[in-house]
Each structure stands twice: as structure tokens, then as C-alpha cells.
From Swiss-Prot:
GO terms for biological process: peptidyl-lysine methylation. It is an enzyme of class 2 (transferase). It comes from Mus musculus (Mouse). Residues 1-27 are annotated as: Disordered. This is EEF1A lysine methyltransferase 2.
Length: 244
């Protein structure tokens, strides 16, 4: 049930455009952007895990997780830095973070079934020191704050497909990110629905591009592009403090 090694898990229809074109005007509202859809998905995956031990899909594949962890190691993100996984789903990325030594990890999802699934998988792995919370990232609790690193692998994509005013929800996402991420903190996003240029525009208020991560390329009809966009943003601010 896992996704391919790179690219797409099958949960969100890819809308990456070749260079020079935009997918922003091509989105069609979809049930894939609704809470009801994801509740149903994770209720089904929870039953499957309980019956067969199958953890479910790995969002964008294992390589997407490895890419993010390699970046964190390359830039010497402290192992005790606070990390937030936005839309954690089955929590498999949380498991990988722990395996690589990270110890201050929080996973959130607005689907209670997703959090139940994550908790079951973490219990099977013998992990009890990870924070799991049912949280709507568009309306986060006041306790959700002060993170050094925030990670998104598909949640912003899903929000973009919401039938109920997706444009405003994307703006609210950026506001929420600004609230929960510390000044000079890092935001790592992987998207199949948005190009680099579109993500730069979406997160231009309060964030700056720190690095673009390499992802597989494709070519079609003489034009080229990436199967996914993977970017690292840093939150702007006046503080000169680094993660410590």
C-alpha cells in the first residue's frame, strides 16, 4: 500500500506544471480537500493496520522522507530541536525521525482517525516519547507554538483542493505557520500541486527561500519540470539567534 519510491501516493492528483506554466488556475475543488474524506481514509487504514499490520501509504514515498532527514542532518539541526509534522497522517515520518535520533517531535492531524492510527503504529514500534495531537492547522491551539522546524508533505496540497474557499484557507495556512514557527525557524514543504515559483509567491509574506531540494525531473513535449517541488523556507525576523 506504500507509495512509489518517489512522486505520488495516490491521495492527491498531481498538478505540477512544466516550467513556465501555472497550475494555480487549474485546480478543481475536490473531496480530497475535505476532512470527511480523510476521516474515511484513516478509518479504513486503521482497520487495515489492526487486521494486517499494514501501516498504509508513505506520503510521496520513502525518498521524500529521506530527502528531508538528509537536509536536517546536513545542516546540523540539533537532535533536540522541536519538530512539527503538519498533517502527520499515519505518523511514519515521525518514526523515521526518531530512528535518526530526533527526540522532540510533535505530529498533528485534524483527523482523529489519523492520530489513532499514528498512535497504534508508534506503540507497535515501542515509541512513547512523541507528541500526537488532534489539531486543525488552520485554527491551531495557543499551545501549538515555538517550533524550530515544521514539515509539510501534502497537507498544503490537500488544502488547495478544499471546495470551501481554498484561496482563503491557503492564506490562513501561512498565518498559522507564522504563529507556530520560531523566528529563523525552518519550514520544509514537499508539494506535487505547486511549482517552486508558486510556492515562493504563496509564502513570500514572512518567509524567505533558504534552499531548493533536488527532486526527480520529467520532460514532455520539449518542456521540462519536476515531479514534485521540495523547498526549505526560513522565517524572517530581527533576531540573530540560531537554533540552539
Amino acid at each position: 500500500m506504500n507509495a512509489d519510491a518517489e512522486g505520488h501516493s495516490g491521495a492527491v492528483v498531481p498538478a505540477q506544471s512544466p516550467e513556465g506554466s501555472s497550475a494555480a488556475d487549474d485546480f478543481v475543488p475536490s473531496a480530497l480537500g475535505t476532512r470527511e474524506h480523510w476521516d474515511a481514509v484513516y478509518e479504513r487504514e486503521l482497520r487495515t493496520f489492526q487486521e494486517y499490520g499494514d501501516t498504509g501509504e508513505i506520503w510521496f514515498g520513502e525518498e521524500s522522507m529521506n530527502r528531508l532527514i538528509r537536509w536536517m542532518q546536513k545542516h546540523k539541526i540539533p537532535l533536540d530541536a522541536s519538530v512539527l509534522d503538519i498533517g502527520t497522517g499515519n505518523g511514519v515520518f515521525l518514526v523515521e525521525l526518531v530512528k535518526h535520533g530526533f527526540s522532540n517531535i510533535t505530529g498533528i492531524d485534524y483527523s482523529p482517525s489519523a492520530i489513532k492510527l499514528s498512535a497504534s503504529i508508534l506503540e507497535k514500534e515501542g515509541l512513547s516519547n512523541i507528541n500526537l495531537k488532534v489539531e486543525d492547522f488552520l485554527n491551531p491551539s495557543t499551545k501549538l507554538s515555538g517550533f524550530h522546524v515544521c514539515v509539510d508533505k501534502g497537507t498544503y496540497d490537500a488544502i488547495s483542493l478544499n471546495p470551501d474557499n481554498a484561496i482563503e484557507k491557503r492564506k490562513q495556512y501561512v498565518m498559522s505557520l507564522s504563529r507556530v514557527l520560531e523566528v529563523k525557524g525552518f519550514f520544509l514543504i514537499t508539494s506535487c500541486n505547486w511549482t517552486k515559483a508558486e510556492l515562493l509567491d504563496a509564502f513570500s509574506e514572512g518567509f524567505e527561500l533558504f534552499e531548493e531540494l533536488p527532486t526527480p525531473k520529467f520532460s514532455f513535449g520539449g518542456r521540462s519540470g519536476n515531479t514534485v517541488a521540495a523547498l526549505v523556507f526560513q522565517k524572517r525576523g530581527t533576531s540573530l539567534d540560531k537554533i540552539s
